[in-house]
């Protein structure tokens, strides 16, 4: 998207944040838009927060859960995995800070108890731990090999859940051409 505009000057900020920070940043106009997901576990709480902050959610796509693992993970050759298959491996998740409720969790299966847990703040650390410790995280399955390389792969997770990934924006506002181009790029990628 940045190359698309080929401007002599620009000032973009791309943040990877906790769920509540995404909502706060869009509500307080620190960010033009945010990307998050809704599930049967978090939908009611997140929609209530969005309404209270005069934000709207626009679904981009629905996905069945997948896991990200390193390409040489012992389960990498499987066509799908179960939560039981993953029991011996470290579960990597995003820290939610003082908003520790599973309603803010970035992972769909946050209510499932695990023996090995590691919480991180950013994707680079998560991917490094996935490769170094044979860890895994639960995700939408969308990955850019152009950005992340071939070291991380996605495997379908055999659970009866879904995630609706979408954008949040302020009510009654129009996106800038940069914001719209970003969303268009996401739509093309999925």
Locate predicted features.
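Flexible hinge/capping segments at coil-to-helix
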Residues: 49-91
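Central regulatory/effector-binding core of bacterial HTH transcription factors
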Residues: 1-45
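Extended ligand-binding regions for polar small-molecule ligands
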Residues: 84, 164, 168-190
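Beta-alpha-beta core module
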Residues: 45, 52-58, 62-64, 124-173
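Hydrophobic hinge/microswitch elements
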Residues: 18, 27-32, 37, 96-153
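Short hydrophobic/charged patches on amphipathic alpha-helices used for structural packing
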Residues: 23-27, 57, 83, 126-127
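Secondary-structure junction motif
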Residues: 39, 43, 83, 87-112, ...
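Short helix-loop capping/hinge motifs at secondary-structure junctions, enriched
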Residues: 72-81, 159-161, 172-178
